[in-house]
Amino acid sequence: MNTPLNPNAFHELTAQAAVLHHAGGQFSMETLTLKDLRDDEVLVKLLATGVCHTDISFMGRPFMVDKPVVLGHEGAGYVYAVGSQVKHLRVGDPVVLSFDACGHCESCEAHQPSYCHDFINHNFLAQRPDGTTAWQGPSGPVRHAFFGQSSFATYSVCHERNAIKMDDDHDLEMFGPLGCGFQTGAGAVLNVLQPKTSQAIVVFGVGSVGLAAVMAATAMKARQIIAVDLKDSRLEMAKQVGATHTIRGDQCPDIVSEIKSITGAGAHCSLDTTANMTVLRQAVECLRPQGVCGFVGGASAGSELVVDVRDIMIGGKTVRGIVEG
């Protein structure tokens, strides 16, 4: 196990990180120096990280995150050092990193941190809430704390709120995606949609998030689990983890009618993972009366969903966003 970091030698600790200097650019591997670790922060030596579509999306966006920045938000590793106010983690603990939150707003107090009133500041801006950064690069400060972690590096400065201790470190390098993609898909089904054993659910888009949703629906023993995607390989994997029906979206002339044919009157709930507004509309239209459509896809700011309001009103349908499950 790693030796704890000497609090008086922060300037000696360096990390290798994939740094993005401008929107649409390529990552540059650079050596960063840790400037400080605050009393309420945790330093994690990363073992592995997943790559989420959100990371790729933010690479091309000139807004939200100033540069240079370290992205990544599906990290897993071991606690290397802790600040004096950290209560629940110790050096050597295996952890999976997830999103951050303020910890004290109305949503956080209600144990709904993914709807934190200050979510953007704690996750998208890639800096501490006070605007500072812990890492120094060759040409100046480098933004970190993307989703509270910036895991495209060998070390991560995070908070104990978003460093989840694991009971076992077996295959820890495989656990990173649990902190975002898998919890988003599975959590949307387990915590929000909650299909009953007599009900039907449709998952639009079965990449990692959608497959996690299918697995959760399987665990809840939903009667019908319909997966919709454009790739045969994904649909085949969806079958392997519990989908009872699959639809190849680009080969089905009327997806909504096909779903209603399978389910009888429409799905009880649906989940869109694609952020495609045409697909999201289908996810709403395929519902039976009083059905619920949840969406988790990261749509661009300003995206507009065009739906038949009369259909939603008369059908008593619900359409809601879901963040991090």
Describe the predicted segments one by one.
Residues 200-206, 215-282:
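Adenosine-nucleotide cofactor-binding segment
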Residues 16-18, 28, 33, 45, ...:
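Residues located in well-ordered beta-strands
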Residues 35-49, 62-109, 114, 167-169:
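Glycine-rich beta-strand-centered segment in the early N-terminal region that forms part
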Residues 106-204:
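NAD(P)H dinucleotide-binding glycine-rich loop of Rossmann-like/cofactor-binding domains
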Residues 205-208, 298:
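Glycine-rich Rossmann-fold phosphate-binding loop(s) that bind the pyrophosphate
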Residues 277-325:
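Glycine-rich phosphate-binding loop and adjacent beta-alpha segment
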